[in-house]
Each structure stands twice: as structure tokens, then as C-alpha cells.
């Protein structure tokens, strides 16, 4: 009789424990992916501080009008996206998996917040970049300095120095 009660208890409550275990694992996987992306962003920021423009880049930029500098944050954004691409792809995969399999409210809230922070895009700066003349666009896209994250304010200060 005791064995039957124990077996009945296991059959009734084991699925709840298993579901909680899976939910905990999904939440942990999601947190790990977010942390990995955060670490990569910090690494890319360090790259930005170490990335210094060449003299030819500075002299090229000195001849440009002030309106040209409004596209530099967008160019830096593109470089940061390139730098963090693998981690964002991994996070997107984990988000998709957890989103379709999770029912816990805290996990769902974490998913929504992470999606907003990580994958929201402002296209207004892209318009300014696309409106550049072909020579300027080609220079930026082919220049090694702009292919890595960089300090936008530091670059502007170097260009405006006399």
C-alpha cells in the first residue's frame, strides 16, 4: 500500500518538478547568453578605445563639412554590430527557443526586455549614411579604422584639433 501511494505521488507531482527543472534551465541558458553578449560588448568598447585613426583618415575628415560627422555614430553602430554578431545570433536562437517553450512569467518578461534592448533598430541614421556621396561612402566602408568600433567623440576632437 505504501508503495502504491508513493508511486501515485510520483506520477502526480513528477511532471511539475520536471517542468520547473526545464524552466530553470531555460532561464539559466537565457541569462548566460545575455551575460556573454554583455561581455562581448565590453570587449568591443575596449577595442573602440584602442582603435586610433591614421593621419590620412584624419586629414581626409578635416576636409569634410560638419554635417558629415552626423553619420559617424551610425558607422560606429555598424562596427559594434559586426563585433557582437556571433553573440547576438546565439542570443536570438536562445530567445526563440525559450520564448516558444517557456510559460514562467519572469522568463517571459526577461525575453521581452531583452528583445527590446538588444534588437531595436533606429533607421533614421541610415538615411543620412545612404545620402552620402559615393566617394565618402566608399572611403568609410573600405577604411580599416571604421571597420572596428571607435570612439566617435575622440575622433571628432582629433579632427577639430588644429
Give residue spans per PLM region.
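Immediate post-signal-peptide N-terminus of mature secreted/exported proteins
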Residues: 19-66
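Processing junctions and N-termini across compartments
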Residues: 14, 37-38, 74-78
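Classical Sec-dependent N-terminal signal peptides that target proteins to the secretory pathway
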Residues: 1-21
Amino acid at each position: 500500500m505504501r508503495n502504491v501511494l508513493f508511486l501515485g505521488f510520483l506520477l502526480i507531482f513528477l511532471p511539475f518538478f520536471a517542468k520547473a527543472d526545464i524552466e530553470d534551465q531555460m532561464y539559466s541558458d537565457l541569462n548566460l547568453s545575455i551575460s556573454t553578449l554583455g561581455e562581448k560588448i565590453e570587449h568591443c568598447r575596449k577595442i573602440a578605445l584602442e582603435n586610433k585613426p591614421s593621419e590620412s583618415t584624419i586629414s581626409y575628415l578635416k576636409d569634410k563639412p560638419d554635417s558629415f560627422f552626423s553619420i559617424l555614430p551610425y558607422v560606429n553602430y555598424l562596427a559594434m554590430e559586426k563585433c557582437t554578431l556571433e553573440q547576438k545570433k546565439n542570443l536570438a536562437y536562445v530567445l526563440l527557443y525559450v520564448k516558444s517553450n517557456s510559460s514562467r512569467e519572469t522568463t517571459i518578461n526577461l525575453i521581452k526586455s531583452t528583445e527590446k534592448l538588444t534588437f531595436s533598430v533606429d533607421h533614421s541614421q541610415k538615411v543620412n549614411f545612404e545620402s552620402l556621396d559615393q566617394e565618402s561612402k566608399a572611403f568609410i566602408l573600405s577604411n580599416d579604422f571604421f571597420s572596428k568600433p571607435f570612439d566617435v567623440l575622440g575622433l571628432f576632437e582629433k579632427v577639430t584639433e588644429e
